[in-house]
Amino acid sequence: MRRRGGRIAALASAAILVVAGCSAPNRDGGSAGGNAEIGKSSDINPQDPASLKKGGNLRLAIGALPSNFNTLNIDGNEADNGSMQRPTMPRSFTIAPDGSMKVNTDYFTSVELTKTDPQVVTYTINPKATWSDGAPITWEDIASQINATSGKDKAFAIASPNGSDRVASVTRGVDDKQAVVTFAQHYPEWRGMFAGNTMLLPKSMTANPDVFNKGQLDKPGPSAGPFVVSSVDRTAQRVTLSRNPNWWGTPPLLDSITFLALDDAARIPALQNNTIDATGIASLDELKIAQGTEGISIRRAPGPSWYHL
């Protein structure tokens, strides 16, 4: 996805994102870049994927490499870690441009509330869905993760139960590709149990406390996405994702995604130096720098926010 033209800066309601062309070697203007004016409340410049070129390396910044790649673990529960692994892991729902939730059919053919008293949710897994180690994704992965994050065994250092503490049982459905989750207490946010940064992990990574807590300290475990983590370089503070050769869904346009650990103060200079392709803006000073840099465009869109109380 090499984009002729400059870098793009996007402004959200509470934050600004500055984006450069996807590793583009040139910075000679173009429809996707070079405009440093702040647009309307939403001007993200959406494009039909069919109109985009294939290939390229998207370079993004993160705060630091995670001390634990397990996003369900208390030490791995970081926004950057979740964002970095989203292209590599199963999630049950996606958010459409209009804000609605849709079943992620790459992984599930259906996710339905099949009973209300007691509450029962049935997950039917895509027959093609497979972990990167060759194991099929089955109901046992869902059962193992719910057991690990339920809080019943305190040896699992979980970040949050995320509804697992309300589950009475997880049973096999019509076959190994279906999980029937029965709740002991109603859980209105059941759609979020395997969505967002709470991705589904393989049972090999949630089967016991030792592997849950220590099995992903150096690198992620088996994954199942259009991309796989192909390199973790702690010396260079860089993580590289490459295409999953066994991906069963729509092939990604990008060849790779690179995440580079940078301090906040280093991100705008890195964008100016064409080291990264996108970053957020957190202050008026950074906005002014972005506006004054040739080849940078600023994009703005509403962004949801929430607080722990």
Predicted regions and their residues:
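Ligand-binding "clamshell"
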Residues: 288-300
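Short, well-ordered beta-strand elements
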Residues: 55-64, 109, 119-123, 145-146, ...
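N-terminal lobe/hinge region of extracytoplasmic solute-binding protein
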Residues: 58-116, 147, 222
